[in-house]
Design a protein with these regions (language model features):
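Ligand-binding clefts of soluble mixed alpha/beta catalytic domains
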Residues: 1-540
Length: 540
C-alpha cells in the first residue's frame, strides 16, 4: 500500500526564535497545570475531609474506580466556571468526560458534592448539557454519578426556567433513552427535588444504602407542607426505593459496590455498531511532538508554517496534501491520527477567495468519502479591501462556511492561535457544531483583535468630535478597549464560559484528538439517500 509523504520540519532547535517559543510555551503549560490542579481540589480540603468522613469516595476517585484500570479519561471543560460566582464553583461543581468502562466508551457525569453540596449553578447546567450533547452525537452511554442538592436556589432564575436550563437534562435523558443510548445512574448521595428525575428517568439505577437519597421534597419541605416529621433515609433512602417504590433497581452497600454494579450493567450492553471508517494501527509521528513548543510561536501574529504542527500530530508525520499550489494560506490534506483517517484544514495565513474555495472543495471531498475533519485554527479573518470585495470574497467565503455547516462527518477543532471574526466561522468555530473544540493556552478568540476594535471605535468617535479630540484623548479612549478585548479573548475566559471543551497543553493535542476520534467512531455516519443522491463534489 502506497503511503503519504512524510513531512519534515524546517524549524531550527538552535535558533533564538525556537528557544524563545519553547520558554514561553513552558510557562503557559505550567500555568495551565496550576489552574487544573486547583480545579481538581473541588470545594477545598475541609469540604473534601467532610465528604470522606461520611464514608464517601471523593468525586474523582469515583470516576477513577468506574473506569477500566489504566485507561484514559478525556475530561470536558475542567476549568468551567473558573473565576465566576466568586470562585465558589471550581469545575462548575461537576466532573464530565469520556472514559472506557467495561471496554465501552461512555460519557460520565459526576456531581462534586464538595462544591456547594453539588448544587447546580448556571455553568453546572451548561456543562451537564454539553456532556449529554457529546453522548447524543457520538451515541455513547451516559453514566450519572449523582450526589447533588439540586438547583442553586439563589440563582434559580438562571438555572430553572429557560429551554437550556435544568429541565433540559431530563428531556435529554428521555430522548437519548428513546434513541437507544443507555442511561445509567448511581445515587451516591443526595438526589433532591428535580434532580430526583436523574435516576427515575434512567434505564437502570443503583443506590447506596444509608447514603443515597431520592426525593422530590426533602424532610424540611415535607414538615412545612404536611407537618410530617421524617428522616431523609425514611423518606427516600435505599431501602425505600429498592424494596418499596421501585425507583431504583440495585441496592449497594457503599460507593465501591455501586460502581462495580454500574460496570456490570455496562458489560451487559449490546455491542456497538461497526466502525464507520477503517482504523489502522497507530504510528508515532516521525517528527518529535515535543518540538511543538519550539516550532510554534506563542503570538498568533508571528507567521510560521502550520505544517510544523501537522507533522507533530499525525501518524508517521505522513500528510497527503491537497491542492498544495493553490490557495496556499489554507493547508488541506489527508492523514491519520491514532489510526483514524482525517482530513486536515489548517490556517497558514489570512483567507483569500482561493483559500476559501479550496477549503470548500476539500470539505466536500471528506464528506463524500466519510472522513472526519480536523480544523487547526489560527486565523485573523478574510482579506479585506475594494479589489477583494469586487472579486467576490464574501460569496467565496460563504461557500466554505456552507460546506462547514452542512458536512455530515465529525468535525474536531483545535484553536492553536487566533480565532477572529468570520475566520472563526469558516474554520468550524463553536457555532458550527464541531463534535469537540479545544484551545491551546496561547489561543485568542474575539470578533476582531483588540487593536483593530479600538481603532474602529476611535475612528467613529473622532468623526463625531472632529478637531477637538487630541492624540492623548484618543489613546485614553483606546486603552480600555484593548484591555477589554485582551481579557475577553483569553483562552481561560473562554473556557470558563464553556465556549470550548477545554484548554489543552499543545503536547497533548495528538492524544486528545485520538481519544475524541475513538469516541466519534461509536456513531454511524448519516447515510445519503441513493435514490435521491443530491449533488456531487463541486470544483470550486
Amino acid at each position: 500500500m502506497q503511503q503519504a509523504p512524510v513531512l519534515a520540519s524546517a524549524a531550527d532547535p538552535a535558533s533564538e526564535a525556537w528557544q524563545a517559543n519553547e520558554a514561553a510555551h513552558h510557562a503557559l503549560a505550567d500555568e495551565l497545570r496550576t489552574r487544573l490542579a486547583t480545579a481538581r481540589l473541588g470545594g477545598g480540603e475541609k469540604a473534601r475531609a467532610r465528604h470522606v468522613a461520611r464514608g464517601k469516595l471523593l468525586p474523582r476517585d469515583r470516576v477513577d474506580t468506574l473506569l477500566d484500570p489504566g485507561s484514559p479519561f478525556l475530561e470536558l471543560a475542567p476549568l468551567a466556571a473558573e473565576g465566576l460566582y466568586g470562585g465558589a464553583a471550581p469545575a462548575a461543581g461537576v466532573i464530565a468526560g469520556i472514559g472506557r468502562v467495561s471496554g465501552r466508551e461512555c460519557v460520565i457525569v459526576a456531581n462534586d458534592a464538595t462544591v456547594k453540596g453539588g448544587t447546580y449553578y448556571p455553568m453546572t447546567v451548561k456543562k451537564h448539557l454539553r456532556a449529554q450533547e457529546v453522548a447524543l452525537e457520538n451515541r455513547l452511554p451516559c453514566l450519572y454519578l449523582v450526589d447533588s442538592g439540586g438547583a442553586f436556589l439563589p440563582m434559580q432564575d438562571e438555572v430553572f426556567p429557560d429551554r437550556e436550563h435544568f429541565g433540559r437534562i431530563f428531556y435529554n435523558q428521555a430522548r437519548m433513552s428513546g434513541a437507544g443510548i443507555p442511561q445509567i445512574a448511581a445515587v451516591l448521595g443526595s438526589c433532591t427535588a428535580g434532580g430526583a428525575y436523574v435516576p427515575a428517568m434512567s434505564d437502570e439505577a443503583v443506590i447506596v444504602r444509608n447514603q443515597g437519597t431520592i426525593f422530590l421534597g426533602g424532610p424540611p419541605l415535607v414538615k412545612a407542607a404536611t407537618g410530617e416529621v421524617v428522616t431523609a433515609e425514611e423518606l427516600g433512602g435505599g431501602e425505600v426505593h429498592s424494596r418499596t417504590s421501585g425507583v431504583t433497581d440495585h441496592l449497594a452497600e457503599d460507593d465501591a459496590h455501586a460502581l462495580r454494579i454500574v460496570r456490570n450493567i455496562v458489560a451487559t450492553l449490546p455491542d456497538r455498531a461497526a466502525l464507520p471508517w477503517s482504523v489502522r494501527p497507530a504510528e508515532e509521528p516521525k517528527v518529535d511532538p515535543a518540538g511543538l513548543y519550539g516550532a510554534v510561536p506563542v503570538d498568533s501574529r508571528t507567521p510560521y508554517d502550520v505544517r510544523e504542527v501537522i507533522a507533530r500530530v499525525v501518524d508517521g508525520s505522513r500528510f497527503a496534501e491537497f491542492k498544495a499550489e493553490y490557495g496556499t494560506t489554507l493547508i488541506t490534506g489527508f492523514a491519520r491520527i491514532h489510526g483514524h483517517p482525517v482530513g486536515i484544514v489548517a490556517n497558514n495565513g489570512i483567507l483569500f477567495s482561493e483559500s476559501a474555495q479550496k477549503g470548500a472543495h476539500f470539505i466536500e471531498l471528506c464528506d463524500q468519502r466519510g472522513i472526519p475533519l480536523v480544523f487547526l485554527q489560527n486565523i485573523s479573518g478574510f482579506m479585506v479591501g475594494r479589489d477583494y470585495e469586487a472579486g467576490g470574497i464574501a460569496k467565496h467565503g460563504a461557500k466554505m462556511v456552507t460546506a462547514v455547516a452542512c458536512t455530515r462527518v465529525p468535525k474536531l477543532t483545535v484553536v492553536v492561535g487566533g480565532s477572529y471574526g468570520a475566520g472563526n466561522y469558516s474554520m468550524c468555530g463553536r457555532a458550527y457544531s464541531p463534535r469537540f473544540l479545544w484551545m491551546w493556552p496561547n489561543a485568542k478568540i474575539s470578533v476582531m483583535g483588540g487593536e483593530q476594535a479600538a481603532s474602529v471605535l476611535a475612528t467613529v468617535k473622532r468623526d463625531q468630535l472632529g478637531d477637538d479630540w487630541s492624540a492623548a484623548d484618543e489613546e485614553a479612549f483606546k486603552a480600555p478597549i484593548r484591555e477589554q478585548y485582551e481579557t475577553q479573548g483569553n483562552a481561560y475566559y473562554a473556557t470558563a464560559r464553556l465556549w470550548d471543551d477545554g484548554v489543552i497543553d499543545p503536547l497533548e493535542t495528538r492524544q486528545v484528538l485520538g481519544l475524541a476520534l475513538t469516541a466519534c467512531a461509536n456513531a454511524p455516519l448519516p447515510q445519503k439517500d441513493h435514490a435521491a443522491p443530491g449533488f456531487g463534489v463541486f470544483r470550486m
